[in-house]
Amino acid sequence: MRKRFLAAMLLALGIGLFGGWGSAQANSVAETTQSMLHVCWLKDAHVNPAACEVVRMPDAFEPAKAVVTSSVDFPDFQVVALDLREVSAEGYPVFNVQSIYYKDFLRATEPIIIVMRDSESFPRNGIAVRDSLGRERVFGIAISGEDGSLLLSEVER
């Protein structure tokens, strides 16, 4: 209960929101990986939805459709469900991560549409890829409090 209260207080104060959950461990590879991944609402994407693969999250909220693209091919692409497990001693949210969908590669030429679960304060939808060093990187898909756009932010397991 205390950890949930702390997380709610951090949210209320705007601390840690969209500044990069887990950014204390970020390095140049993680930042480069994140800069090559892109997410936006389907209505804002320049893609033909009929030509895209669609992944539906459990308990999907039909209007919440995101498009994930990348500027390079990423191995071991996953769409993941995120559930807040705890807040670390440093104040970072730590998530349980459950793989919902796996694909050998997220190809730069093949956008994927995700019909997302409804998100509240913390992201409940995410993606995972393997970076150039072979490490798995997990990113939450969050809604910006400023303009309603979608953001990717690395999360901790």
Predicted regions and their residues:
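Boundary at the C-terminal end of the N-terminal hydrophobic targeting segment
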Residues: 24-28
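Bacterial N-terminal signal peptides
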Residues: 9-19
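Disulfide-bonded cysteine motifs in exported proteins
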Residues: 35, 45-47
